[in-house]
Amino acid sequence: MAKVSSEIAIQAFDFRKNNSLNDIEPINCKSLLLKLNVLTVYRPLSDDFSGMCLRKGDLKFMLLNSKHSRGKQHYTIAHEFYHLFCQVDFKPHACNPGNAKGADASEKLADAFASELLMPEMGLKKMIPLQELGSKDISVSTILKLENYFSVSHSALIFRLRNLDLITPKQYEFLSQLKIKQTAKEYGFDLSLYESGNEGLVIGDFGIKAKQLYSDMKISESHYYELMNSIGIDPTDDTNEE
């Protein structure tokens, strides 16, 4: 298990390096999806369906559940990055990251990769006050700061901290019982991380290519509309700009 953990940590480190990210900073998942040219579509899906991805040659696609919190969406994106860019024998399937119980080996590896990628160990430690780090008694305010800084869900963060032995089992249980959205509100944090969102959002250059084909008169107007409608966009809708 230690060997597997080390290999996953190296893969996450290399992924950051290959994408010009240092080894401690938080990741902007949407910017990275655009940079890596992964066509990404957000749709409301069932609660046990977090997302999935497809890969064929240089073409990459990701489907994400807009009903899940933004923090969980970010974890799902990182999980799918493992399937798209690290896993050799990848086969498309529905994913429910963070639910490793009963999951196959590749899902557990993808979860481990997501944790390493989004919450690098040294990045976490640098954000935790030394006194709290030494006592393994991390304050609620620091917990909230960490999950908002790294843009991850509360459950993903405390699981990572426990896995790194940065909090005790007792504190993990205490933090697990928090009503995190209410707690974040009481501490003055923005609540968008803990809420669903992005329904209908499309990330990627699909629309750019479709528009270019239409502008170059290589496809008809009706074909252009058909392509845009396939990703949930109606170009004829008035945006009401003044």
Model region roles, listed by residue range:
Residues 1-242:
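Active-site hotspot residues in diverse enzymes, especially metal/ion-binding acidic/histidine motifs
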